[in-house]
């Protein structure tokens, strides 16, 4: 998530909002105050899948707040 001086994040319609909110691509998860505890056992991952984690795209998809608290560039989807 990008911030503009720690106080601005790109909000809806590519306009800057309050807080460090990034692009707010997941608004339903934005302000949740719940905890989830997952218990269980999973099989060990083999090396074929371990390297694939490096290919994820950044969450804000190049959406950053500039020095004047405007999104620059903003490609929110």
From Swiss-Prot:
The gene is MT2B. It comes from Arabidopsis thaliana. Keywords: Metal-binding, Metal-thiolate cluster. Belongs to the metallothionein superfamily. Type 15 family. It comes from the Eukaryota. Expressed in vascular tissues of all organs. Expressed in root and leaf phloem, pollen and root hairs. The keyword Metal-binding applies. GO terms for molecular function: copper ion binding. Metallothioneins have a high content of cysteine residues that bind various heavy metals. Functions as a metal chelator of copper (Cu) and zinc (Zn). Functions cooperatively with the phytochelatin synthase PCS1 to protect plants from Cu and cadmium toxicity. Plays a role in Cu homeostasis, specifically in the remobilization of Cu from senescing leaves. The mobilization of Cu from internal sources is important for seed development. This is Metallothionein-like protein 2B.
């Amino acid at each position: 998530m990008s911030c503009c001086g720690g106080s601005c994040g790109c909000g809806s319609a590519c306009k800057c909002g309050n807080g460090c909110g990034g692009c707010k691509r997941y608004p339903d998860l934005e302000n949740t105050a719940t905890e989830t505890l997952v218990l269980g056992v999973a099989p060990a991952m083999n090396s074929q899948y371990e390297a694939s984690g490096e290919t994820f795209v950044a969450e804000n998809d190049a959406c950053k707040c500039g020095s004047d608290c405007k999104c620059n560039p903003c490609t929110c989807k």
